[in-house]
């Protein structure tokens, strides 16, 4: 698939949210009537080319929900949300991770997956890899396995892929 359609709809916004940062804005991609569908299809093609065959999709709050549900629909799979703390009503596993300034946490229902599940993690952006690594750790707590991780965008200079060594990592667009 030609990824120019996707790349052309990601807008670089300099100095946001602070000076020196180039923010990659996906809202034009989502606003395009074909944007989400084309992105999900491109993700499905990438998985197929790598022989990755998940049994369920996990999307990380919040933009991972958007792309994760779309990909789950294309692949005919279920979707499990990975949430910020306090958003899930039943018993959860929780993993904390470091941010540039401070820390954050993610949660997942303890019964979100079966031990036989092969979970694909979906999110919009791979930067430092902290959020993705925490998501992997949550999945592993459920005894399921991680089939791979796929992102719309990867910021290569932040080395997030290195944090995820040992896992199948894909990104559609790299900067």
Curated annotation (Swiss-Prot):
Coiled-coil parts of chain: none
GO molecular function per UniProt: adenine binding; adenine phosphoribosyltransferase activity; AMP binding
EC number: 2.4.2.7
Main location: cytoplasm
Pathway: Purine metabolism; AMP biosynthesis via salvage pathway; AMP from adenine: step 1/1
Enzyme class, spelled out: transferase
Biological processes per GO annotation: adenine salvage; AMP salvage; purine ribonucleoside salvage
Gene Ontology cellular-component terms listed: cytoplasm
Reactions that this protein is recorded to catalyse: AMP + diphosphate = 5-phospho-alpha-D-ribose 1-diphosphate + adenine
InterPro entries in alphabetical order: Ade_phspho_trans (IPR005764), PRibTrfase_dom (IPR000836), PRTase-like (IPR029057), UPRTase/APRTase (IPR050054)
Subcellular location: Cytoplasm
Keywords of the record: Cytoplasm, Glycosyltransferase, Purine salvage, Transferase
UniProt xrefs under Pfam families: Pribosyltran
SUPFAM superfamilies recorded: PRTase-like
Membership in a protein family: Belongs to the purine/pyrimidine phosphoribosyltransferase family.
Function: Catalyzes a salvage reaction resulting in the formation of AMP, that is energically less costly than de novo synthesis.
HAMAP family for this protein: Aden_phosphoribosyltr
Subunit structure, interactors included: Homodimer.
PANTHER family named in the record: ADENINE PHOSPHORIBOSYLTRANSFERASE (PTHR32315:SF3)
Protein name as it appears in the record: Adenine phosphoribosyltransferase
Name of the coding gene: apt
